[in-house]
Amino acid sequence: MSKKALCIISGGMDSTLCAYLAKKEGYEIIALHFDYEQRTQEKEKECFKQICKALKVEKSYILDVSFIKDIGGNALTDKSIDIPKNELCISDIPPITYVPFRNGIFLSIAGSLAEKENCESIFIGVVEEDGSGYPDCTDEFIQKAQEFINEGTSKNFKVCIKTPLVRLNKAKIVELALKENVPLELTWSCYESEDEACGECDSCLLRLRGFEKAGFKDKIKYKS
């Protein structure tokens, strides 16, 4: 029986690279995507499906967690709140694009699915550099989440949450992704647009800076 990993794939660079690294480690990948009615959900879902096809994933899940939008309080799900432009968050205070406890919600559900599918690992693409001010993107939080899942599941099930990118910056992530032949042109990072990336939101700026510092050109289309 092959070892299995549940890979949480948003459609972005980091989670996609994590899935490729899981495959390199010899895991059979079960892919998981969450629809929480964020602004770019349709584009992210399209990217997820293309990434699964590129990885030859045989089993995938797209789960509706739209109650996250009902909770609100963030610019990703509430279109009445403007997405900040041309400024990178460097504060310890969560930015308005922070979705409260999102990774906690995702990992709780992933833990349930991992137990059902008998996965020995969960891969999630959290990056501390990206998560400045995001309390659920730290290595400490992930370790606590792993303890929580293992405490709350059956005694004969133990899962390891793997975060291979947590200490890397965006340039290193781009370099590693290209080294591993990850099709970054299939990924999406923009918080606001689904046709052409805005090039101005926090996520676009981090992505563009990563490509620039790594010395490579991003192949996706940008408005600016």
From Swiss-Prot:
Tell me if Zinc is a UniProt keyword of this record: yes
> Does the record's keyword annotation contain Ion transport?
no
One annotated GO molecular function: ATP binding
Give residues annotated as binding Zn(2+).
190, 198, 201, 204
Q: What is its EC number?
A: 6.3.4.20
Which cofactors are reported in the record for this sequence?
Answer: Zn(2+)
Q: Which Gene3D superfamilies match?
A: HUPs (3.40.50.620)
Cofactor: bound how, per the entry note? Binds 1 zinc ion per subunit.
Q: Which UniProt keywords apply?
A: ATP-binding, Ligase, Metal-binding, Nucleotide-binding, Queuosine biosynthesis, Zinc
Q: Origin, by domain of life?
A: Bacteria
- List, alphabetically, the SUPFAM superfamilies matched: Adenine nucleotide alpha hydrolases-like
Q: In which pathway does it act?
A: Purine metabolism; 7-cyano-7-deazaguanine biosynthesis
List cystine links: none
InterPro entries from the entry? QueC, Rossmann-like_a/b/a_fold
Query: What is the enzyme's class at the highest EC level?
Result: ligase
Residues that bind ATP: 9-19
Known role = Catalyzes the ATP-dependent conversion of 7-carboxy-7-deazaguanine (CDG) to 7-cyano-7-deazaguanine (preQ(0)).
Q: Which family does it belong to?
A: Belongs to the QueC family.
Q: Which PANTHER family match?
A: 7-CYANO-7-DEAZAGUANINE SYNTHASE (PTHR42914:SF1)
- This chain belongs to the protein called 7-cyano-7-deazaguanine synthase
Name its species.
Campylobacter jejuni subsp. doylei (strain ATCC BAA-1458 / RM4099 / 269.97)
Tell me the lineage of the source organism. Bacteria, Pseudomonadati, Campylobacterota, Epsilonproteobacteria, Campylobacterales
Question: Which gene codes for it?
Answer: queC
